[in-house]
Design a protein with these regions (language model features):
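Short, small/acidic-rich helices and loops at N termini and domain boundaries
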Residues: 1-84, 268-271, 385, 392
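Glycine-biased, small-residue-rich flexible motifs in mid-sequence functional cores and linkers
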Residues: 1-4, 71, 79-402
């Protein structure tokens, strides 16, 4: 825990850029060593006066507050020293020292992860193409990444979820800050089925300058980046250029020659910086040999078929009515086993009887700290009392007699 506290201290220094943070841990070996370094050592590194002052502030209060916030919100901290930290990010000169994760922990190095990026102000064609790509990629076994903005981001994420896959949203602000607010429902769906990621601690506002910095993580986690619609000067092109610098494949959807919203993507194709794509198959064919265990040959959808499935996603599905024989399908266990549980595991089991919830929801409803909830879930599942469903949802696997 002490090592993590020092790491959070370092990453919250005022005026610290990602490349400088990475350089400091390379120079000192660990964040703890940087914390205890002599102030004169900072000055020898040609750091700004503002950053040197911030490094001289040894208060750990904010770091400890962040740890408390993560515990309360059910946010997992993944550091560059952890075995699960993506090698894809460690290859970057400005890798994030910490990732805050709300939802599932993915092994990104093993995933055919494709980032779909594009403009907030997009055309109906762009929305349709982003949704179709997200859907087709998810159906074929790829992991779709994007931001959470209106337009292309939202369409891609919705498509991926409708395609039956998880999705990952990389945010510029904290993982608990939904921006724009109208995407609250989408945010919750992505967190339940996949993950929300950020390098910034909970509560960080999504200020404009944070988005270009965020983009290196979006492209860095991915095997490839697909640009759907972008003007000639846009954040999408920043992400595409970052991807090229990171030796990632770049793909682009063509648009009308005179369409302002396709000027950026058409330019990528014209300069040979991106491969022209018309469907997800044009992306998948590049990765079949690298990810044979991931790519599934899902039958291609027509444009009309994809649109129909995406439109159906907006319609709430009716609640299934159980048949009489299904009303109590769970195996019966003696009540003495329930009484032998501790108070917290028993409360969690009772909450999950007849419903499926993700850990965040359990924390919110029981007010049990996230770490103890996760421990209880692991034990209850190991004892056969709980089942884990897709989207990291848990539900009761047994019932107890009266």
């Amino acid at each position: 825990m002490a090592a993590l506290t020092y790491l959070l201290w370092l990453t919250t220094r005022e005026g610290l850029r990602p490349e400088t943070a990475a350089a400091l841990v390379r120079r000192f070996g660990t964040a703890e060593a940087a914390y205890f370094a002599d102030p004169g050592e900072y000055e020898l590194l040609s750091l700004s006066e503002r950053l040197c002052r911030s490094l001289a502030d040894k208060s750990l209060e904010r770091a400890e507050r962040i740890l408390g916030d993560c515990d309360r919100l059910g946010v997992t901290l993944l550091t560059y020293q952890d075995a699960a930290y993506p090698e894809r990010l460690l290859q970057l000169h400005d890798f994030p020292l910490v990732l805050y994760v709300k939802g599932r922990l993915f092994r990104f190095d093993e995933e055919l992860a494709v980032a779909i990026v594009g403009s907030r102000e997009c055309t109906p064609y762009g929305v349709a193409m982003a949704g179709r790509l997200g859907l087709e990629l998810a159906r074929s076994g790829a992991l779709v990444l994007s931001g959470l903005a209106q337009g292309i981001d939202a369409a891609a994420l919705k498509g991926a979820l409708q395609g039956g896959g998880p999705a990952v949203s990389v945010l510029a602000g904290g993982v608990d800050v939904v921006y724009p607010r109208r995407n609250q429902g989408l945010y919750e769906d992505v967190a339940a089925a996949g993950a929300i990621l950020s390098e910034n601690p909970p509560g960080t506002p999504p200020e404009g300058w944070r988005f270009p910095i965020r983009n290196r993580i979006l492209s860095g986690l991915s095997a490839g980046v697909a640009a759907v619609e972008a003007a000639e000067h846009s954040g999408t092109l920043i992400t595409a250029r970052l991807a090229l610098d990171q030796n990632r494949e770049v793909f682009a959807v063509p648009g009308p020659a005179d369409a302002p919203m396709s000027a950026g993507t058409n330019g990528l194709i014209a300069r040979g910086e991106a491969k022209l794509i018309r469907s997800a198959q044009d992306i998948l064919v590049e990765y079949v040999t690298r990810f044979p265990h991931k790519v599934r040959q899902a039958p291609p959808l027509s444009r009309e078929g994809a649109e129909a499935r995406l439109e159906a996603a907006a319609e709430p599905a009716p609640e299934p009515v159980p048949r009489p024989a299904e009303r109590n399908p769970l195996p019966l266990r003696p009540r003495s086993e329930l009484e032998a549980m501790g108070d917290e595991p028993r409360a969690i089991f009772a909450l999950l009887s007849g419903r499926a919830l993700v850990p965040d929801e359990i924390v919110g409803r029981t007010e049990i700290p996230a770490r103890r909830v996760n421990t209880a879930l692991t034990l209850l599942q190991a004892q056969g009392y709980l089942n884990e469903l897709p989207g990291k949802r848990f539900t009761a696997a047994v019932r107890f007699d009266d």
